[in-house]
Amino acid sequence: MKEDPYLEVKRHLAREAAALVTSGMLLGLGSGSTSREFIKAVAERKKQENLDIRAVASSKESYSLASSLGIPLIDDEEFINTDLAVDGADEIDPQLRMIKGGGGAIFREKILLQSSQRRLILADESKSVKVLGKFGLPVEISPFGRSSIIATLENFGYLGNLRKNPRGGFFITNNGNYIYDIHTPNVYPHPEEDLLKLLQIHGIIEAGFVIENVEVWLGYTNGQIGKKNTGGL
């Protein structure tokens, strides 16, 4: 497996974010490589300082990692609010609009962000872009009417492919849905408009644009962390 050139940046971001955690908190755990480092950093703090914390995970992978490291997890159907949600991003533009969902957990990730008192996105400098779209746009779609949904997407000009798993079958999300990765268009100067258009198509569960009130911490290889906030909560 190719070594991640930004692994140390992600670990630095994760440690700094884990320092925000205090006893009594309910955490929202995102998915992806940066979120994995945050989970590890939180588990280390819990072990060293005996923190009384609980968490909700956005994916089976994050759930398994947190559980294996001793972080108690609550029923993911019963939580109302979390104190702090921490996640990563695939692309972030200058207005802090972003694309997420490369790991296929965008639906759950957005619910955790929505429910949290504090929403923190951690990303290395490679995720900063002038215009969203180069990464591609993941869209979670219903298995029922799959071909019809895809035809509607194509009629709107959104061309892509159903994501495959390593065994060659269709990738299935934790909610039992498919991921349709849009590769055309590949630039989104006005992602709010595209998000609205996509969510009006019946059968689309969620789209990978994140346009929320969030904090963004951008980590650099020189050790610095740039901190920005879109306002709001």
Swiss-Prot record:
Name any GO cellular component annotation: cytosol
Tell me where the transmembrane regions lie: none
Instruction: State the EC number(s).
Output: 5.3.1.6
Return the InterPro entries for the record: NagB/RpiA_transferase-like, Ribose5P_isomerase_typA_subgr, Ribose5P_isomerase_type_A
One Pfam family linked to the record: Rib_5-P_isom_A
Lineage, top-rank taxon, reads Bacteria
The family database entries (SUPFAM superfamilies) matched by this protein are listed as:
D-ribose-5-phosphate isomerase (RpiA), lid domain, NagB/RpiA/CoA transferase-like
Q: Name one GO molecular function term.
A: ribose-5-phosphate isomerase activity
List the catalysed reactions. Answer: aldehydo-D-ribose 5-phosphate = D-ribulose 5-phosphate
Q: In which pathway does it act?
A: Carbohydrate degradation; pentose phosphate pathway; D-ribose 5-phosphate from D-ribulose 5-phosphate (non-oxidative stage): step 1/1
Which residues bind substrate per the record? S31, G32, S33, T34, D87, G88, A89, D90, K100, G101, G102, G103, K127
Tell me yes or no: is Isomerase among this UniProt entry's keywords: yes
Q: Which of UniProt's keywords are assigned here?
A: Isomerase
Q: Catalytic center at which residues?
A: E109 (proton acceptor)
What are the BP-aspect GO terms?
Answer: D-ribose metabolic process; pentose-phosphate shunt, non-oxidative branch
Q: Has keyword Cytoplasm?
A: no
**What is known about its subunit structure?**
Homodimer.
Tell me, what does this protein do in biology? Catalyzes the reversible conversion of ribose-5-phosphate to ribulose 5-phosphate.
Q: So what family is this one in?
A: Belongs to the ribose 5-phosphate isomerase family.
Q: What is this protein called?
A: Ribose-5-phosphate isomerase A
Q: State the organism's lineage.
A: Bacteria, Pseudomonadati, Chlamydiota, Chlamydiia, Chlamydiales
